[in-house]
C-alpha cells in the first residue's frame, strides 16, 4: 500500500468527513445504551502538521485552517463547533500543529461505556495507531485488513453504533468491492449506522457505485458530496454515503454543507450535493 494520509491530514476531505462523523457521534450518545465504533481503515491516529509530509503538500492550510478562521452563520457555526473544539484540543496554544484521525476524534465523543475497534493493516501506521490509543480502555487497535474486519467484528454485542469505512482507493475495483461489502455488512448488523467515504475522480465509477447501493434493498441511504473545484490538486471532490443515518442528520447537513463548501472552494466547479439514494426523499 502506497497511500500515506500524513500528506493529506486536515485537508478539505478530512474536514468534510470528520465534521459529519462528529455529528453522528453526538446523535449516538443521546441514548444511554452503549455503542460501538468500528473504523475499518483507521490510519495512524494522529498527524503532525509541522512534519515533512504535511509541510510538503500544505493541504491542511486549505482545509482545517480555512475553516477555523472563517466566520459562519450562527446555526452552521453551532453545528461545527464540537468538531472544531475537538481539533483544537490536540494543539496547545493558538497554532494548529497536530490533526487527529478518525479514531482519536471518535474517542473525544465516546463515553465510558462505549467501545472503539480501530483497524489498520499497514505496519508503520498500525504501530502508530497502537501508540496513539494506548492506555484508553475503550479502544482496541487491531492490525487487520479493514475488509476482513467487517466480517470478523460484525455484529458486535452492542445494538447501536457506527461503522466508518474509509479505504485508500488504490485498487481499480475498490468501488465495486465497497458496494458489495457494505451490503453484506448491513445484513449482518442492520441496526448500525454506516459511513462510507469515497474520492470523486471517476464520475462513471461513482455513479455505478451509487446505483448499486440504491438497488441493494437497504432502507435509508443518504449521499453527501463536497467539491472544492478545479485547481485544488489531485483530489477536487469527495463524497459520503450514510446508511441508517440518525434522523436529524440530513437537516443538519442542509444547514452545514453550503457554508462549509463556500469556505473550502478553491476554483470553478465547487459546491455540494445532498440527496437520498433510498428512503426519505
Q: Language-model segments: which ranges?
A:
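Class I S-adenosyl-L-methionine-dependent methyltransferase catalytic core
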Residues: 1-281
Amino acid at each position: 500500500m502506497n497511500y500515506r494520509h500524513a500528506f493529506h491530514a486536515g485537508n478539505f476531505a478530512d474536514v468534510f468527513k470528520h465534521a459529519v462523523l462528529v455529528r453522528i457521534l453526538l446523535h449516538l450518545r443521546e441514548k444511554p445504551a452503549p455503542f460501538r465504533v468500528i473504523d475499518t481503515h483507521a490510519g495512524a491516529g494522529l498527524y503532525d502538521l509541522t512534519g515533512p509530509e504535511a509541510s510538503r503538500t500544505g493541504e491542511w492550510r486549505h482545509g482545517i485552517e480555512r475553516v477555523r478562521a472563517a466566520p459562519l452563520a450562527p446555526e452552521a457555526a453551532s453545528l461545527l463547533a464540537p468538531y472544531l473544539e475537538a481539533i483544537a484540543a490536540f494543539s496547545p496554544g493558538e497554532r494548529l500543529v497536530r490533526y487527529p484521525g478518525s479514531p482519536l476524534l471518535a474517542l473525544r465523543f465516546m463515553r465510558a461505556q462505549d467501545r472503539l475497534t480501530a483497524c489498520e493493516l499497514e505496519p508503520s501506521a498500525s504501530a502508530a495507531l497502537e501508540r496513539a490509543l494506548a492506555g484508553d480502555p475503550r479502544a482496541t487497535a487491531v492490525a487487520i485488513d479493514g475488509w476482513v474486519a467487517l466480517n470478523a467484528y460484525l455484529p458486535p454485542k452492542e445494538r447501536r453504533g457506527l461503522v466508518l469505512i474509509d479505504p485508500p482507493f488504490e485498487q481499480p475495483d475498490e468501488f465495486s468491492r465497497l458496494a458489495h461489502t457494505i451490503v453484506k455488512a448491513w445484513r449482518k448488523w442492520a441496526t448500525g449506522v454506516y459511513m462510507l467515504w469515497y474520492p470523486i475522480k471517476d464520475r462513471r465509477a461513482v455513479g455505478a457505485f451509487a446505483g448499486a447501493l440504491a438497488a441493494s434493498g437497504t432502507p435509508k441511504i443518504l449521499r453527501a458530496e463536497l467539491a472544492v473545484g478545479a485547481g485544488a490538486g489531485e483530489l477536487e471532490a469527495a463524497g459520503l454515503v450514510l446508511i441508517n443515518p440518525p434522523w436529524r442528520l440530513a437537516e443538519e447537513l442542509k444547514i452545514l454543507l453550503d457554508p462549509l463548501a463556500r469556505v473550502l472552494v478553491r476554483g470553478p466547479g465547487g459546491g455540494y450535493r445532498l440527496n437520498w439514494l433510498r428512503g426519505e426523499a
